[in-house]
């Protein structure tokens, strides 16, 4: 199958894993500065806070999205740093905009029904990273402009879970056409994987791409604190967000 290439800057080659470097300097708070980042939305009673992939908790002092319907999810957040640490939080921030990322659990292994339910349609894998206990995946796929919602899933490769750290990314296009390529983001909650007991292991993700079957290895520790890293910033791209589930 032909993959219709797109020319969206080709991810620029100079970008970091999920996009541009920071515009925000923690030592110089200014309302005209901002950063765009993938974070976890954490409900806290009648409100919420944001948790970065380095473990920092951010308190939204102000927001341009007062009607945001929050839940435990991953999200792309454009924010401006307003203050240094406050009790219980690393920084106070202003949310300029926030957009939820499709956030899913690992789906069950269905044996002979894997292909019919989860699909075998190829994708182009653009980026993959683990942060705050989630696998964030940026990918591209062909679409037929029919309005059909595609399904993306992360599934085990063994019925008996004998190899729990090898998973498969699946794409079900439901027979949609191939008029154009679009990209999207999805995050998978990895909390159902076995405890690594403090060890860092290889997490292997198998993917059917337009160039054939490929495997990607990432370092994984079930304790998010052992995986803390400086968060990757991203360019918002919702081409596919309304067409996948």
What do these predicted regions represent?
Residues 1-9:
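Bacterial N-terminal signal peptides that target proteins for export
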Residues 3, 15-41:
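Bacterial Sec-dependent N-terminal signal peptides
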């Amino acid at each position: 199958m032909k993959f219709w290439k797109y020319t969206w800057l080709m991810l620029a080659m100079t970008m970091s894993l999920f996009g541009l470097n920071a515009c925000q300097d923690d030592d110089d708070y200014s309302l005209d500065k901002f950063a765009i980042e993938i974070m976890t939305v954490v409900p806290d009673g009648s409100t919420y806070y944001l948790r970065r992939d380095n473990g920092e908790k951010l308190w939204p002092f102000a927001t341009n999205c007062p009607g945001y319907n929050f839940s435990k999810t991953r999200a792309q957040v454009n924010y401006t740093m307003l203050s240094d640490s406050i009790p219980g939080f690393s920084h106070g921030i202003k949310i300029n905009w926030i957009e939820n990322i499709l956030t899913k659990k690992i789906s069950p292994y269905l044996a002979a029904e894997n292909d019919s339910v989860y699909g075998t349609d190829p994708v182009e894998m653009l980026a993959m990273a683990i942060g705050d206990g989630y696998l964030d995946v940026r990918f591209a796929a062909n679409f037929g402009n029919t309005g059909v919602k595609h399904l993306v899933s992360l599934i085990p490769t063994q019925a008996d879970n004998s190899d729990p750290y090898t998973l498969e990314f699946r794409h079900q296009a439901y027979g949609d056409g191939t008029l154009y390529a679009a990209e999207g983001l999805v995050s998978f909650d990895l909390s159902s994987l076995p405890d690594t007991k403090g060890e860092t292991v290889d997490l292997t993700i198998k993917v059917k791409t337009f160039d054939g079957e490929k495997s990607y290895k990432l370092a994984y520790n079930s304790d998010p604190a052992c995986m803390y890293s400086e968060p990757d910033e991203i360019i918002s791209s919702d081409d596919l967000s309304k067409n996948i589930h």
